[in-house]
């Protein structure tokens, strides 16, 4: 009898082969080695192939009900980046020299309402559910948001969306580390001022999206502090 726990999946339509490409020790070592870069070497660039893999890691990330409420904006325009800097205290010394700068956006409340054009598109065009199943699917969405998670205000619902965006961010950070590329997630910015600048510059439509977080990718040009984390005993509780 096979000891491969994923063998039973290989013949199921639509289910990928889950053969591991890294062992547990390799993955743990990767996570131990990953760190947030504080300064970048402006002469070293991430290849387009590697950047595409990072974006693919974000695209393939899980999301609640499979709604994928994110959008990624790659900002190449250096003039715009310079305009952004006064509003991004957490990006000083990073944004200027990083190879790639990405804004991660979340979809606004109206986009995430049952029967919105976006959720209908996800249901029918992306997830390939039949149109007849739309009512049941949207009804489940209402129950999930309003009752199961008791999300009543627009702010609460936007925060729920942002949680999904952070799942994509986490996968992008791990993918970049797996390829030896440094990264910096950035929350240190003046949200309202930066949203005003980006929407005025036509970076995104504020009726559709809101700004969630930034991330930079490149190659570090500085030493970094030793990584510190709490021990497992402080972060894990086991209930038998």
Describe each PLM feature range:
Residues 1-240:
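Acidic, surface-exposed loops and disordered segments
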């Amino acid at each position: 009898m096979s000891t491969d726990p994923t063998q039973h999946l290989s013949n199921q339509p639509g289910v990928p082969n889950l053969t591991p490409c890294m062992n547990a020790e390799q993955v743990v070592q990767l996570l131990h080695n990953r760190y947030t870069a504080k300064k970048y070497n402006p002469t070293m660039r991430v290849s387009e192939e590697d950047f595409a893999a990072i974006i693919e890691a974000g695209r393939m990330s899980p999301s609640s009900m499979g709604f994928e409420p994110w959008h990624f904006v790659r900002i190449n325009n250096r003039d715009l980046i310079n305009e952004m800097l006064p509003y991004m205290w957490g990006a000083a010394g990073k944004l200027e020299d990083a190879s790639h700068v990405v804004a991660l956006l979340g979809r606004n409340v109206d986009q995430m309402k049952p029967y919105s054009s976006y959720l209908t598109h996800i249901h029918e065009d992306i997830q390939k559910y039949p149109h007849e199943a739309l009512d049941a699917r949207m009804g489940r969405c209402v129950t999930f948001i309003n009752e199961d998670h008791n999300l009543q205000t627009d702010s609460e619902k936007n925060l729920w969306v942002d949680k999904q965006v952070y799942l994509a961010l986490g996968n992008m950070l791990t993918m970049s580390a797996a390829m030896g590329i440094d990264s910096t997630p950035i929350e240190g910015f003046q949200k309202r001022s930066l949203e005003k600048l980006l929407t005025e510059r036509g970076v995104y439509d504020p009726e559709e999206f809101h700004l969630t977080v930034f991330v930079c990718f490149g190659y570090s040009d500085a030493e970094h502090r030793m990584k510190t984390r709490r021990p497992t005993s402080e972060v894990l509780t086991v209930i038998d």
